[in-house]
Regions:
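Conserved glycine-rich cofactor-binding loop
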Residues: 25-26
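Catalytic Tyr-X3-Lys loop
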Residues: 103, 110-129, 148, 171
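Conserved Rossmann-fold SDR core element
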Residues: 36, 66, 93-95, 172, ...
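The beta1-alpha1 cofactor-binding region of Rossmann-like NAD(H)/NADP(H)-dependent oxidoreductases
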Residues: 50-51, 71-83, 114, 232
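Substrate-binding pocket helix/loop in short-chain dehydrogenase/reductase
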Residues: 108-109, 113-121, 202, 210-213, ...
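Catalytic loop of short-chain dehydrogenase/reductase
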Residues: 148-170, 175-184, 196-197
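Amphipathic alpha-helical dimer-interface segment in Rossmann-like NAD(P)H-dependent oxidoreductases
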Residues: 114, 123-142, 179-180, 184
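Active-site loop of short-chain dehydrogenase/reductase
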Residues: 17, 65-66, 93-94, 139-153, ...
Length: 233
């Protein structure tokens, strides 16, 4: 990887590996893709927005990395099956999956419609399950691999976003189950809750939400990055 992006980890840490990143067109997914590519991985970007995926692929290749992209709505089973099949056909395997795609909106429980509830749960839970299952069945069951599920800090629940809190808690349980059931195939399954990150995802929230997060999580109570972590790149 040449000038433009430099990782803090060892060079070529993931050389020769194929890693899928969902939600790879923006925010945490975009930054994860850059990090993985800088460490030698070929990154398969998955998302719904073609233009965003093309932009991130271009960024990575201009930095000297390797990436391609697949337009897919992870909420749809057949689309997920076809996407994983396409990745395996192109690269012969899937070494790792970063289940990052997700979304939610601020609203109290009594105002959430069934349509709104299902949209969030299908993205934040069902879609992640489908991606993990197909990566396992189509590649990892025979070769081993790693699954990283990006969740949220929902251990104190998520008032104002109950649909997302329920889905994220479900994803943590799924992660633990997958770690046990798929261990015999050499598959590691972990969940990561990055905390509050100032990325493009914040654009979907009212302006006062960002101010609330900064006041709720002062830098003295956070990791060294400070209160509201700024995504890099």
């Amino acid at each position: 990887m040449e000038a433009g992006y430099t990782s803090v980890f060892a060079k070529d840490l993931f050389k020769g590996q194929v890693v899928i990143v969902t939600g790879g067109g923006s925010g945490i997914g975009r930054c994860s893709a850059h990090e993985l590519a800088s460490l030698g991985a070929h990154v398969a970007l998955v998302g719904r927005n073609l233009e965003k995926l093309q932009t991130v692929q271009k960024e990575i290749t201009e930095d000297g990395g390797s990436a391609d992209f697949y337009v897919c709505d992870i909420r749809h089973e057949e689309a997920v099956k076809a996407t994983i099949a396409a990745v395996v056909a192109a690269h012969g395997k899937v070494d790792a999956l970063v289940n990052n795609a997700g979304g939610q909106y601020v609203t109290p429980l009594e105002a959430i419609s069934v349509k709104g509830w299902e949209a969030v749960v299908n993205t934040n839970l069902t879609g992640g399950f489908l991606m993990a299952r197909e990566c396992y069945l189509q590649s990892m069951k025979a070769r081993g691999g790693a699954i990283v599920n990006i969740v949220a800090d929902m251990w104190g629940s998520m008032p104002g976003m109950g649909h997302s809190g329920a889905a994220r808690a479900g994803m943590v349980s799924f992660t633990e189950t997958a770690a046990v059931e798929w261990a015999h195939s050499g598959v590691r399954s972990n969940a990561v809750a990055p905390g509050n990150v100032a990325s493009s995802g914040m654009d979907h929230y009212p302006p006062e939400v960002g101010k609330m997060l900064v006041s709720k999580f002062p830098s003295s109570n956070m990791c060294p990055w400070g209160g509201l972590r700024q995504r890099q790149k």
